[in-house]
């Protein structure tokens, strides 16, 4: 038989648990608020494609959610390079149930980079990623990542934007700490490193425009609660269409680490994340997946 004290404590715990559960955000209500807000903005009822409750992971003061919606393609007046109608993607931050779908802090980054868009077009038409990534050891220092694409050209190419957001506890707001845009047709990549000696860094690989046709590699690092800043840029030796099964960032990793003083010839080769390669080798300063 439980003692009176035990029963009281148990009852208090049940009441506390019920109170916390009662404070949980109503995702359906939030989504409806976003759809209503976007309908007023664009005159089109969008469909919710992402809903992330940011409160638990970032331990936010207010209730924060990320809600992303897409306009139905058939109701859009915008066409892609192939003549197909394509609906815009809208990104909304929701604080205590109140959606902000203005995307002003995202658009500000485009203006800073002097990137403009065709009149009447939206910056986002395809969503590649909307998730939480970790920039510290043991899945710490979370960042919110959004990766999206502009309207596609006739060859399918588009501008791939990568945004990383950190939670500012003092301001109780999310803010952009990293932004860039690349193409997508030539093995470009922007990657937040989540393990190894470059944990928390962002690596970018993008093609050169003149011979020899290789790739530029950049490393961006964040210190304290500041934005990311570039700490390394070099022209790599990975060639276009060289047949290497590794991504450009992985093929260039030994050289990237060497230039940062984190690897030297004779050290074990860096193992790419999620690799299925049975044998890694070096060829002319580039890491290769050897199929033989």
Which residues does each predicted region cover?
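Surface-exposed loop/turn elements that mediate protein-protein interactions on large endomembrane-trafficking
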Residues: 90-112, 163-180, 219-233
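Bacterial N-terminal signal peptides
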Residues: 7-16
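Structural motif
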Residues: 84-90, 152-165, 209-221
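Short helix-loop boundary/capping segments
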Residues: 154-205
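Positively charged n-region of N-terminal signal peptides that target proteins for export
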Residues: 1-5
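Acidic, small-residue rich beta-repeat scaffolds with periodic aromatic anchors
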Residues: 19-63, 68-84, 189-292
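Hydrophobic beta-strand segments that make up the repeating blades of beta-propeller
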Residues: 142-148, 202-207
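Short N-terminal edge-element motif at the start of the domain
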Residues: 89-140, 146, 151-153
């Amino acid at each position: 038989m439980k003692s009176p004290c035990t029963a009281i404590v148990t009852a208090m715990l049940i009441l506390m648990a019920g109170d916390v559960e009662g404070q949980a955000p109503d995702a359906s209500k939030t989504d409806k608020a976003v759809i209503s807000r976007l309908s007023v903005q664009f005159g089109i009822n969008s469909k919710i494609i992402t809903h992330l409750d940011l409160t638990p992971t970032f331990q936010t003061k207010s209730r924060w959610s990320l809600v992303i919606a897409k306009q139905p393609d058939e109701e859009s007046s915008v066409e892609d390079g192939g003549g197909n109608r394509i609906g815009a993607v809208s990104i909304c931050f929701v604080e205590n149930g109140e959606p902000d779908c203005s995307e002003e802090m995202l658009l500000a980054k485009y203006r800073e980079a002097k990137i403009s868009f065709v009149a009447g077009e939206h910056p986002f038409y395809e969503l590649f990623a909307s998730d939480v990534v970790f920039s510290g050891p043991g899945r710490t220092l979370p960042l919110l990542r959004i990766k999206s694409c502009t309207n596609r050209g006739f060859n399918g190419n588009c501008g791939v934007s990568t945004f990383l957001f950190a939670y500012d506890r003092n301001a109780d707001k999310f803010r952009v700490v990293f932004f860039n845009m690349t193409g997508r047709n030539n093995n470009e990549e922007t990657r937040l490193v989540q393990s190894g000696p470059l944990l928390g860094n962002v690596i970018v690989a993008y093609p050169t425009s003149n011979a020899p046709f290789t790739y530029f590699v950049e490393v961006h690092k964040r210190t304290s609660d500041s934005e990311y800043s570039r700490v390394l840029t070099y022209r790599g030796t990975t060639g276009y269409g060289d047949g290497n099964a590794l991504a450009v960032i992985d093929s260039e990793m030994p050289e990237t680490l060497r230039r940062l003083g984190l690897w030297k010839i004779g050290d074990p080769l860096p193992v790419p994340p999620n690799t299925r390669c049975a044998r890694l080798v070096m060829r002319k300063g580039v890491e290769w997946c050897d199929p033989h």
